[in-house]
């Protein structure tokens, strides 16, 4: 392990942690692996060309040794991740304890900037009242690690900070033994899934984050928000500006296994988790509030609750708060029982709360009484946190969005029209479709009849909307609030969804005006769709019917923007610019029609799917596009990295809120030169499309990446492609990006950029100067280049050439790889020119250090992957080769800390 990289005194503790874990892993290898494997791993730690070392050693290894070597390299990546996570937390705590200036991206710093920017309390309160930030957890299959493996990692992460606190050799030896024990369990556990995840598995995985993290992190973060704001603005109150949302169980786009049943299962699991949390917190409150009426006064409304209490122990006669809490718990658990949840209550069950608000009202009575009668500290502790939790989580824990492809909605509408004796919907042009849909939306009568036999597809689609209606009735109105139309291209796509909502009782016409219980959200995802977003929405805003519908939803229109497909469609530069342009256009359009806009950013974990640091990404949004309202998807390995630990979760959510407030209240940002950016986009698009439309490109991609093996990894419940793969557009964006990361090209995040810069700057020093100026001063361009720099630092063209050797047509591969290699050279040169530096990551020491530590094991895993792919292509039925490929895919993803 290249610990000489950690020569900065600030990294001394990281070096010690890494060495400590390394020694534990070597202890394990000496016991569990052959001497040849142990020696090879030791050589890798100091090798300058670990892929070449693997190529030399591999012929000497049998199947068991190959497995052990691959697993060992992957485990080194995992323990380095853990050591770095612990170190980040350590440095943050040291920074905070030393009283240094608040870090960028913290709420403390944001509030300081607001105060320095002369924002007064009224304007801050107004902004907070109009702020809504949601991190939306999705089931997109990008988490390669099993939950079992993640649990082992969490145990090591919890143990490692104890190393610094060990004061003698015996304590250190005990800690060593504990970590050795966890590592042995990890070593003897299968790293890969043997069976495909079901939708219910994904739901359970998503729910598990809440008791592990969110139930603790959100109340703490709200408490910090209140402290930070009230320190600067004493009269400001913090409403519920931050929530967690989800898609898991309601996202049907491309997933035939999502249904009304999975939606119901999801909310039962949500409710089970949140009611167990409430029961636990109420039980703790019961123990913390034995206040006696001999010692304190108690408000009448709390005495009234106590009088209804099922807790009739004689010792409780003088303890009204405990009696009131027993009453509240019995009613809350009564609600849990009415929802079919099998959990008990030591006080029995009383009439269920009709809503989370009623539950909240009773808790607030306790708080008010404590404050009124001199017990403010007790009121502002656990009770305040529980009140905040109930107001945020309700009975549903997190809302789920519904999502389906526009074409699937259209199929249902067409069948409803057919059986109702109406016109042939599919034969209508767009204008005729709009007219027909508006006509039907104006009628009270439904099109659906229970006496007609419909196709399975239509029955399933209507069933999930009907289930959503029932869930809203049972779990609360906030349980399901959005229905997203993926691949939205025309106004008729929005009206078609509206008709399905009407057929399901989620949209009604009252006194000639529509009223919807769910937001209709178009998702614009391809380059063409992004360019057409404004015309589509302007058509909708001109409709009196839709204007009335928006009025019923608070005059807010949510728009979802797709980063993944637009990138696959046009490359990173063009995708980034088209998204920016679409947002600028939408800002002006919404102002024109006096509609409030909320943007929902469909970002992935990788740069090729819109990933990158959230703080910079939000601040780089066009002026006026945030305005306090933002939703962002979080998925797969991102959920694990950001939110599996309460401390990490709190900091990452704090960053989202801080960036949203800064972008909304301090929107003084320079728009990039539109003419210059458009020219850069056009040339980049040209070169990118030349590559992916090359007649030999698809075969090259399939043969020189593990795309087909990724499809067999059992990462998620939905298929890897929408149909038989014959074109790039048939492939989902996740495996597309995932594959390019595995073969170390990261192509979707930079291809075309170098040629664009070279073309524009040739003979034009003014253009070069302008681009350099943007690189220094423009948030949009800075974020683009920063993300590209991080990706190019992980790119290894030499390793990628080894993958090119997997092609069945060496001459054709030589042409395609030659194009890629030359564009990489140009893009790297252009990036360094614009950043005016001689090396990548010069200003990102943390990432440079992280990559340097991982490189020996990461490159070894790539070398193993190439060898195993070569073997698998020759022997397609070789189970060992397939297992090894799967194991290397896991390991490379861990080494890069990214998948798709």
Curated annotation (Swiss-Prot):
Q: Which GO terms describe its cellular component?
A: cytosol
Question: What top-level branch of life does the organism fall under?
Answer: Bacteria
Q: Which UniProt keywords apply?
A: Carbon dioxide fixation, Lyase, Magnesium
Mention one GO biological process in which this protein takes part, according to its record: tricarboxylic acid cycle
Reaction(s) this enzyme catalyzes, per UniProt: oxaloacetate + phosphate = phosphoenolpyruvate + hydrogencarbonate
User: What does the record give as cofactor?
Assistant: Mg(2+)
Entry annotated with the keyword Lyase: yes
* Entry EC no(s): 4.1.1.31
Q: Which residues form the active site?
A: 140, 568
GO molecular function terms noted in the UniProt entry: magnesium ion binding; phosphoenolpyruvate carboxylase activity
- Keyword Transcription listed? The answer is no
Q: Which HAMAP family match?
A: PEPcase_type1
Task: Please give the NCBIfam families that the UniProt record associates with this protein.
Answer: PRK00009.1
Q: What does this protein do?
A: Forms oxaloacetate, a four-carbon dicarboxylic acid source for the tricarboxylic acid cycle.
Name the family: Belongs to the PEPCase type 1 family.
This one is known as Phosphoenolpyruvate carboxylase
Specify the species: Neisseria gonorrhoeae (strain ATCC 700825 / FA 1090)
């Amino acid at each position: 392990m290249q610990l000489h990289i950690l020569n900065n005194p600030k990294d001394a503790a990281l070096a010690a942690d890494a060495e400590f874990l390394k020694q534990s892993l070597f202890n394990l290898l000496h016991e569990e692996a052959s001497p040849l494997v142990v020696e090879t791993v030791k050589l890798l730690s100091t090798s300058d060309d670990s892929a070449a070392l693997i190529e030399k050693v591999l012929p000497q290894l049998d199947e068991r040794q190959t497995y052990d070597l691959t697993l060992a390299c992957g485990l080194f990546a995992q323990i380095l991740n853990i050591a770095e996570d612990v170190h980040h937390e350590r440095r943050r705590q040291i920074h905070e304890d030393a009283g240094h200036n608040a870090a960028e991206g913290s709420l403390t710093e944001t509030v300081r900037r607001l105060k320095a920017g002369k924002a007064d309390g009224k304007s801050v309160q107004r902004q907070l009242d109009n702020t809504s930030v949601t991190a939306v957890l999705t089931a997109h299959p990008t988490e390669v690690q099993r939950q079992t493996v993640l649990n082992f990692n969490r145990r090591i992460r919890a143990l490692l900070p104890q190393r610094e606190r060990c004061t003698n050799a015996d304590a250190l030896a005990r800690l060593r033994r504990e970590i050795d024990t966890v590592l042995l369990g990890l070593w003897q556990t299968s790293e890969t899934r043997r069976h495909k995840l079901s939708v219910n598995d994904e739901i359970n995985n998503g729910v598990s984050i809440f008791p592990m993290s969110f139930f603790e992190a959100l109340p703490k973060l709200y408490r910090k928000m209140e402290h930070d704001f009230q320190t600067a603005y004493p009269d400001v109150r913090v409403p519920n500006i931050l929530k967690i949302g989800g898609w898991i169980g309601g996202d049907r786009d491309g997933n035939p296994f999502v249904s009304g049943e999975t939606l119901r299962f999801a909310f039962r699991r949500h409710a089970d988790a949140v009611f167990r949390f409430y029961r636990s917190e109420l039980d703790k409150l019961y123990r913390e509030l034995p206040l006696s009426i001999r010692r304190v006064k108690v408000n009448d409304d709390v005495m009234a609750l106590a009088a209804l209490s099922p807790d009739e122990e004689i010792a409780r006669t003088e303890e009204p708060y405990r009696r009131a809490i027993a009453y509240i718990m019995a009613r809350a658990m009564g609600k849990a029982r009415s929802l079919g949840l099998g959990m008990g209550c030591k006080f029995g069950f009383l009439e269920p709360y009709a809503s989370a608000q009623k539950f909240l009202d009773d808790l607030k009575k306790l708080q008010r009484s404590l404050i009124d009668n001199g017990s403010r500290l007790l009121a502002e502790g656990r009770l305040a946190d529980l009140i905040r939790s109930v107001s945020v989580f309700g009975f549903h824990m997190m809302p789920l969005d519904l999502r389906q492809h526009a074409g699937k909605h259209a199929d249902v509408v067409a069948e409803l029209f057919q059986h109702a004796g109406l016109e042939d919907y599919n034969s209508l042009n767009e204008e005729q479709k709009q007219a027909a849909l508006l006509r039907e939306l104006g009628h009270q009568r439904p099109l659906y009849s229970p006496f007609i036999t419909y196709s399975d597809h239509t029955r399933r689609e209507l069933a999930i909307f009907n289930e959503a209606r029932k869930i809203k009735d049972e779990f609360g109105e906030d349980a399901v609030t959005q229905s997203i139309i993926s691949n939205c291209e025309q106004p008729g796509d929005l009206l078609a969804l509206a008709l399905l909502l009407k057929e399901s009782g989620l949209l009604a016409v009252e006194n000639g005006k529509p009223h919807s219980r769910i937001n209709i959200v178009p998702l614009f995802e391809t380059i063409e769709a992004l360019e057409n977003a404004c015309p589509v929405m302007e058509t909708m805003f001109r409709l009196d019917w839709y204007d009335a519908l928006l009025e019923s939803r608070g005059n807010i229109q949510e728009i979802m923007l797709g980063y993944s497909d637009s990138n696959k469609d046009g490359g990173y530069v063009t995708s980034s610019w088209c998204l920016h342009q679409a947002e600028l256009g939408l800002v002006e359009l919404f102002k024109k029609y006096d509609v409030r806009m909320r943007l929902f950013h469909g970002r992935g974990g990788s740069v090729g799917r819109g990933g990158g640091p959230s703080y910079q990404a939000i601040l780089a949004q066009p002026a006026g596009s945030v305005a306090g309202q933002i939703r962002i998807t979080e998925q797969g390995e991102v959920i694990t990295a950001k939110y599996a630990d309460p401390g990490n979760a709190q900091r990452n959510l704090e960053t989202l809120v801080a960036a949203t407030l800064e972008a909304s209240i301090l929107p003084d940002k320079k728009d990039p030169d539109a003419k210059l950016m458009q020219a850069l986009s056009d040339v980049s698009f040209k070169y990118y499309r030349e590559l992916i439309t090359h007649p030999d490109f698809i075969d090259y991609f399939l043969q020189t990446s593990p795309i087909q093996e990724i499809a067999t990894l059992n990462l998620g419940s939905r298929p890897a492609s929408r149909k038989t793969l014959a074109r790039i557009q048939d492939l989902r964006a996740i495996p597309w990006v995932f594959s390019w990361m595995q073969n170390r090209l990261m192509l979707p995040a930079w291809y075309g950029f170098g040629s664009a810069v070279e073309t524009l700057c040739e003979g034009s020093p003014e253009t070069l100067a302008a681009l350099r100026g943007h690189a220094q001063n423009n948030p949009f361009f800075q974020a683009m280049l920063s993300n590209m720099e991080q990706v190019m630092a992980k790119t290894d063209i030499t390793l990628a050439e080894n993958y090119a050797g997997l092609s069945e047509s060496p001459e054709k591969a030589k042409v395609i790889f030659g194009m890629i290699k030359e564009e990489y050279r140009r893009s790297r040169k252009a990036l360094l020119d614009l950043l005016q530096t001689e090396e990548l990551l010069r200003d990102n020491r943390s990432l440079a250090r992280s990559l340097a530590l991982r490189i020996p094991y990461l490159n070894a895993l790539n070398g193993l992957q190439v060898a195993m792919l070569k073997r698998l292509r020759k022997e397609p039925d070789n189970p060992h080769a397939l297992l090894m490929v799967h194991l290397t895919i896991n390991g490379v993803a861990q080494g890069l800390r990214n998948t798709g």
